[in-house]
């Protein structure tokens, strides 16, 4: 069974709360009516120069060999930045201990499974922003997050997911308490998406924390007996009830190689 699709991102990039001062909104013209911009001759910039500035509006490279053979759900184009809104999860040692038991067991069914490098719960689909939209988009998000309080949630139900194209499969822990708070967050994120004419989140989403992934559709191998055994491991793990109860303190937006944090009250 396919549940809410998830788009994975690498952990590359650095925390960056600063941006340039461009305030252009989607749909704004590049010059005022009645003004005719003077034509300018533009010469191509050598690759050796472009490579010196990875944070420019050209966006990150699209090289599938750098992220395990994953294929983009949309083609990379110059000036387009893949953008994703989510709740980050900082994995503690005990959580990684649980994963050290779960993953090898799942790999007996699907050997190509690999552990996620970073952990999060998605609040949006992956969308494309033009470079000059990033700052206004983040400002709009921050404005809508200011009224939200921190909350606890529990994610202890093992579930199998695929992305929309069925090109990747994920093992995740589904949220079993705190679902209403996540829906409230998504509602506000969706409002921002609508302001920028971007795709909103899925109807009836299954909020979850992805643990491992593989290329291809591996639901047949992972659902059924394997899923039952993985759930038994979680249920029997020492202090699992406490371990899988998580305090949500912030929402984060990743756009290209830039990260923006929005603390909750």
Curated annotation (Swiss-Prot):
Interacts with PLRG1, CDC5L and PRPF19. AMP binds at residues 120-122, 202, 204-210. It is linked to Poikiloderma with neutropenia: A genodermatosis characterized by poikiloderma, pachyonychia and chronic neutropenia. The disorder starts as a papular erythematous rash on the limbs during the first year of life. It gradually spreads centripetally and, as the papular rash resolves, hypo- and hyperpigmentation result, with development of telangiectasias. Another skin manifestation is pachyonychia, but alopecia and leukoplakia are distinctively absent. Patients have recurrent pneumonias that usually result in reactive airway disease and/or chronic cough. InterPro entries: Usb1. This is U6 snRNA phosphodiesterase 1. Belongs to the 2H phosphoesterase superfamily. USB1 family. Residues 1-72 are annotated as: Disordered. HAMAP family: USB1 (MF_03040). Changing residue 120 to N: Significantly decreases exonuclease activity. GO terms for cellular component: intercellular bridge; nucleoplasm; nucleus. Keywords: Hydrolase, Lyase, Nuclease, Nucleus. Optimum pH is 7.5. Disulfide bonds: none annotated. Pfam families: HVSL. It comes from the Eukaryota. One of its GO terms (molecular function) is lyase activity. Changing residue 208 to N: Loss of exonuclease activity. It comes from Homo sapiens (Human). It catalyses: a 3'-end uridylyl-uridine-RNA = a 3'-end 2',3'-cyclophospho-uridine-RNA + uridine; a 3'-end uridylyl-adenosine-RNA = a 3'-end 2',3'-cyclophospho-uridine-RNA + adenosine.
């Amino acid at each position: 069974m396919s549940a809410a699709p998830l788009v994975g991102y690498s952990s590359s990039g650095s925390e960056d709360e600063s941006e340039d001062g461009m305030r252009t909104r989607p749909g704004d013209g590049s010059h005022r009516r009645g003004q005719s911009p003077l034509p300018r001759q533009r010469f191509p910039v050598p690759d050796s120069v472009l490579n010196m500035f990875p944070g420019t509006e050209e966006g990150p490279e699209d090289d599938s060999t750098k992220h395990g053979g994953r294929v983009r759900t949309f083609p990379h184009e110059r000036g387009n930045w893949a953008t994703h809104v989510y709740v980050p999860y900082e994995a503690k040692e005990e959580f990684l201990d649980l994963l050290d038991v779960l993953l090898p067991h799942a790999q007996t069914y699907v050997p190509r499974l690999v552990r996620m490098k970073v952990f999060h719960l998605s609040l949006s689909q992956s969308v494309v922003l033009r470079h000059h939209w990033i700052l206004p988009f983040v400002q709009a998000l921050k404005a809508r997050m200011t009224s939200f309080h921190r909350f606890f949630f529990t994610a202890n139900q093992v579930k199998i997911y695929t992305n929309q194209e069925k090109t990747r499969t994920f093992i995740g822990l589904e949220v079993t308490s705190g679902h209403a708070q996540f829906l409230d967050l998504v509602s506000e994120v969706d409002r921002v998406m609508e302001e920028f004419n971007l795709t909103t989140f899925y109807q009836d989403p299954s909020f979850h924390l992805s643990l491992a992934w593989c290329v291809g559709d591996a639901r047949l191998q992972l659902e059924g007996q394997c899923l039952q055994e993985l759930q038994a491991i979680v249920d029997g793990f020492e202090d699992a009830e406490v371990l899988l109860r998580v305090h949500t303190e912030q929402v984060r937006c990743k756009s290209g190689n830039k990260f923006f944090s929005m603390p909750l009250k």
